[in-house]
């Protein structure tokens, strides 16, 4: 989860500066409203897919949405684009965050769930911190739009970690439980 939170830390910490650079400060409060709306839509629409066992489709679909959203910051020029980016950013995280939380709780024995959740939340916080720090370093040299686009690499790394380790581990534990 740490890799997936790096762009989140960058967006939350620096979207107001980017909006100011682009002359879109009047739209910025609505960016956060659209971000939350995307999260709400994801919560309402994905539970049936999770219950049907198609978690891989959700993971890769939301990662694709998030990669496209972050790369789209390179072309940010209108308030509508900023609002759409907020919505799709929220949609992607609204799917991933609870899905990975369920992986943690669903594969950990009950006595160890507190430790597992604490580790999960620590990776969450570390990723946000790295994202904020990284964007602070990048903004002066390459600019915020390119910096936001480059954070999409963290999603690709997170997707590779999921593909090579997390999904296999999750399926192994689920099969052992049945």
Question: What positions do the PLM features span?
Answer:
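Intracellular juxtamembrane helix-capping segments at the cytosolic ends
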Residues: 95-108
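Structural signature of the two symmetry-related core transmembrane helices
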Residues: 57-72
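Helix-loop junctions at membrane interfaces in 12-TM secondary transporters
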Residues: 74-85
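A membrane-interface helix-boundary motif in multi-pass transporters
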Residues: 137-155
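Extracytoplasmic gate region of multi-pass secondary transporters
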Residues: 1-32
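Helix-to-loop junctions at the C-terminal end of transmembrane segments
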Residues: 42-54, 139-140
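Multi-pass alpha-helical transporter architecture, strongest
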Residues: 151-178
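Loop-to-transmembrane helix entry/capping segments in MFS-fold secondary transporters
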Residues: 25-26, 110-120
């Amino acid at each position: 989860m740490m890799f997936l939170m790096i762009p989140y830390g960058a967006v939350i910490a620096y979207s107001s500066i980017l909006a100011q650079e682009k002359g879109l400060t009047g739209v910025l409060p609505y960016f956060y409203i659209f971000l939350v709306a995307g999260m709400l839509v994801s919560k309402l629409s994905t539970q049936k897919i999770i219950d049907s066992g198609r978690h891989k489709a959700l993971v890769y679909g939301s990662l694709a949405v998030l990669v496209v959203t972050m790369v789209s910051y390179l072309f940010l020029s209108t308030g509508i684009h900023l609002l759409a980016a907020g919505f799709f950013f929220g949609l992607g995280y609204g799917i991933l965050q609870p899905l990975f939380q369920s992986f943690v709780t669903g594969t950990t024995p009950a006595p160890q769930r507190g430790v597992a959740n604490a580790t999960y939340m620590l990776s969450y916080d570390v990723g946000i911190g790295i994202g904020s720090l990284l964007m602070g370093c990048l903004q002066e040299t390459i600019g915020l739009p390119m910096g936001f686009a480059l954070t999409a690499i963290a999603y690709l790394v997170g997707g590779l970690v999921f593909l090579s380790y997390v999904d296999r581990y999750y399926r192994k534990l689920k099969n052992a439980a049945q």
